[in-house]
Amino acid sequence: LQQTLEQFVNDRQWTNLQFRKNERIVCNFNITVSKYDKDQNIFTCKALIQANRPVYNSAYTSTLYNNVDENFTFKFAEFDQLAFTEERIDNQLTALLAYYAYLIIGLDLDSFAPKGGEDILQRCMNLTNNAQNFDFPGWKAFSDNRNRFAIISDYLDGAMEPFRMLQYNYYRKGLDEMANNVERGRTEITNT
C-alpha cells in the first residue's frame, strides 16, 4: 500500500506547471490504521498530513501545512490500481490523495505569489464538491467545521484573503527575503 500511494502521488503531474526535482514540495502522509475490515477491504485510519516549503537560498524549510484528518477511511485491496480523473470521482483513496495534493500545491503557490494557488485550490474545491456522494466521512458540506469540505471552502472564502496575503508576505517577503536582507525580511515578518 505504501509503495502504491507514493507512486500515485509522486508520479502524477498534478498541474501544467513545470518544476525541477529540487523544487518539489516535501510532504508526508503519516497514516495510522485503527481498523481493517478484511471482508470489504476497508481501512479506517487517521492521517497526519504535513508539507514543508523551502526557504529561498537556505537549507531551511518551514512548515506550510500540518493537519490531522480523523476520517482518512478508504477501500483498498492488494493489487488495486489507483486511477484518477477529475471529472469523475469514483474512488475514495484517490480522491483523498488528490484532495491533499491540490490543497498543498495551492497553498505552496499562494506562498510564492498573492493568491497564486487560486486555480489549483478551485480544482480542490471542485473535487470536494464531486465527492459529496461518497459514503465515507469527511466530505459532506456542513457536517463538520474541520472536515475536508470546510477546510477548502473556508480557505477560498473572500474573508480569508487577508490570511492568504499573510501567507505570501510571511514566506515570500519575509523568510525568502532574509537571504538578501535579514533586516528587511525580519521587518516584513514582524509586520505580518
What are these regions (language model features)?
Residues 17, 68, 75-79, 158, ...:
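Generic signature of intrinsically disordered, low-complexity segments enriched in small/polar residues
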Residues 1-44, 55-57:
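Start-of-domain marker
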